[in-house]
């Protein structure tokens, strides 16, 4: 059976792994997933990630905890295959008054809402992180 929404699967795997206190989580890799993992790493929500070149490419995400609790409190999918969510540069969402981030897929690559505003581009709002 094929996977309908690979990014939602990635976010769910991260949420579930953090819920049970795992140090790492492994999933099938794709360019979009690697880009999202890079944004999460750059923003300090995960410790890092790696892509293995085994028979099938796998993405391993190293989860981050603070005082025994997950750093990521909320990880929600916004745009999904059945209902895409696009926002112009002036309509990009702020998450929790700027405390969280929205990950946006733009013509200049996958970036945070703040970086997209600074670059003056809009795009598809993939997910929000707090």
UniProtKB/Swiss-Prot annotation:
Example of a GO MF term: rRNA binding
One BP term from GO: translation
Gene Ontology cellular-component terms listed: ribonucleoprotein complex; ribosome
Pfam families in UniProt: Ribosomal_S8
Signal peptide: none
PROSITE patterns (UniProt xref): RIBOSOMAL_S8
Keyword Transport among UniProt keywords: no
Keyword terms: Ribonucleoprotein, Ribosomal protein, RNA-binding, rRNA-binding
Domain of life: Bacteria
Family: Belongs to the universal ribosomal protein uS8 family.
Chain's role: One of the primary rRNA binding proteins, it binds directly to 16S rRNA central domain where it helps coordinate assembly of the platform of the 30S subunit.
Stored PANTHER family: 40S RIBOSOMAL PROTEIN S15A
Oligomeric form and interacting partners: Part of the 30S ribosomal subunit. Contacts proteins S5 and S12.
Protein name: Small ribosomal subunit protein uS8
Species for this entry: Cellvibrio japonicus (strain Ueda107)
Gene it is expressed from: rpsH
